[in-house]
Regions:
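Two-component signal transduction core modules
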Residues: 61, 92, 119-120
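Short, aromatic/basic amphipathic alpha-helical patches
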Residues: 27-31, 78-82, 104-113
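Two-component/phosphorelay signaling modules centered on CheY-like receiver
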Residues: 21-43
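Output/docking surface of receiver
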Residues: 96-136
Length: 137
């Protein structure tokens, strides 16, 4: 179940797997905001993300995509496959810097069009928009 019961309310588990630790902390803080119902956990490293998904059964998995191993799109899609195998209802959201990685951003967009991911977010969006996207998955 992708929900955790906490203090009489249901909390949606979110796993964040990002290369940029400052960005990851900012996303986690945004998702934990006073009005949200998210239980946010950070993956220690990409090689532990699928295992964490198996243990936590998350509502959503947010992963940063870059041009560098182990954050390349192909590697992220492998993690997606492993996560979906253990948690079929888990929503997959990729985050990409559309200014620094234009071609990669185009490929992430195509992955969404092809149905490989549930959504994507550009790194330049506001915290409020990020929260709204995750809330409406």
């Amino acid at each position: 179940m992708p929900f955790l019961r906490k203090r009489g309310e249901y909390m949606r588990r979110i796993i964040v797997d990002m290369q940029n630790l400052l960005f990851a902390d900012a996303i986690a803080r945004t998702l934990r905001s006073a009005d949200s119902d998210f239980d946010v956990r950070r993956s220690e490293s990409p090689d532990k993300t699928a295992e964490l998904c198996s243990l936590c059964q998350p509502y959503a998995l947010l992963m940063e995509v870059t041009g560098y191993t182990p954050w390349k799109l192909e590697e992220r899609l492998k993690i997606r496959d492993e996560a979906k195998e253990q948690s079929p209802h888990c929503k997959i959201v990729l985050i990409v810097d559309e200014n620094a990685e234009k071609e990669l951003a185009r490929r992430v967009l195509q992955a969404k069009k092809d149905g490989l991911i549930d959504n994507f977010i550009y790194g330049s969006v506001s915290a409020a928009y990020l929260l709204a996207v995750i809330d409406t998955l």
